[in-house]
Amino acid sequence: MEKPFAITLDPGSSLANHTGSWRTSRPVYLDRLPPCNKQCPAGEDIQGWLFHAESGDYESAWRHLTKDNPFPAIMGRVCYHTCEGACNRGKLDESVGINSVEHFLGDEALKRGWKLTGPTTDSGKHVLVVGAGPSGMSAAYHLRRFGHRVTVHEAGPFLGGMMRFGIPKYRLPRDILEAEMQRVVDLGVKVELNSKVENILETMQAGKFDAAFLAVGAHIGKRAMIPAGDAAKIIDAISLLRSMEGEDKPMLGRRVVVYGGGNTAIDVARTAKRMGAEPLIVYRRTREKMPAHDFEVEDAMQEGIMVKWLSTIKQANESSLTIEKMALDSKGFPQPTGEFETIEADSLVLALGQDVDLGLLEGVPGLQVSDGVVQVAANMMTGHPGIFAGGDMVPAERNVTVGIGHGKQAARHIDAWLRGEEHVPAPQREVATFEHLNTWYYADAPKTVRPVLDVIRRQSTFDEVQGGLDETNALFEARRCLSCGNCFECDNCYGVCPDNAVIKLGPGKRFKFNYDYCKGCGM
């Protein structure tokens, strides 16, 4: 009987056996877009700065972050961190605490006195920015880094815009706000406070500006047609929050009713609680339809704030309100029932939304205004050449993160326009979804939760409610990042390859593959 054919190899080496010939697939580098990056309205490279943070190089992490967003200490406190909702780790155990690490980096930078990187050239161009809120100051920062002279006109007495007048101190301490605003000014940005722009064309001509970015915040509170007696005390939410920045605090009385269901209504109710009042929120829909974020509502309820659902205010008097109860119809819409109730109230605060003062645009040719906002093209330029707009002035979600992103986008387009060019954003890569990941590499690691001030102190002081992580916890949280879609040289492939087909090239150079021996195992 014939023996089967066989190959004998030198027992000292198996190099002659090119196992790569068995391969049906081969490893290649394919960088995908992390879902957190895609979700971030400010356009941060979250995976990029987390990579530096997890190695303990906090300054590099902060500098990588501030290339896109100059306000990490602010954002670590007020951003609604939708990036965490998109985080792939949330399908493995819990999402990475991106916002808490950003909070830590922002505070670390302030503690260590790190400065923002300034311009290296002078373009000779001068850009006007109207409004010193998140969008305006973000644009000023990026424009200055491009080498342009920047002058910011702010109608109010302070920097910060709606971050100061729309966000209470217990969420955003004013020393943090002022420190991060000042860092932008220190780059050479000129700021003119108490300087309201009445006519944009006249101001541009008088200042010989080459372009303008309009970022006026929504500071005008919307009113409701509520019949009221002469002695009824009615105030809009933004006016109330603004008055909290002055020395003379508003006199609301003990029983304060807040009408509305958004985040501003929550902020006003929590502010009133800290002033010693007994706030009650009246909202015409159910909890499920409330536009305020769930965690904000939960925080308010923990502090003892009550909500009267499915109710509308029909009459305001000196010391009482008449409320009509609502009921949901078959389609889920609230309808009046004809059933009324009288509740005691010393003051009524309307938190029904805000509008932007567009008076500075009167007479500007080419501009299109619709539903109280300015229409802009993809490059964020209005219908008038050289005038760009963003933040609350344009059709978009209104929050700090979106405003900061608008400022950055507009600055890039303004810079290109001033150079007679067009800014073309880089093509977006395919998103690295959970299905693309080899999750068996990662052990369970519970999310680190930031400390919170106890409820008793929250009810009676304006101390910051949410604390920050210490270095140990921030480092742990950064290391929970899966680095979705990008090689970060974790060495797992190098360690598990039985054929030594993965070859290290050194820090930052990734790896190369010996295809003679790689069997394409997919590890």
Label each residue range with its predicted role:
Residues 268, 393-421:
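A conserved FAD-binding loop/helix module that cradles the flavin
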Residues 125-151, 264-273:
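N-terminal Rossmann-like FAD-binding beta1-loop-alpha1 element of flavoenzymes
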Residues 101-121, 179-194, 200, 221-275, ...:
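Glycine-rich dinucleotide-binding loop and its adjacent helix/turn
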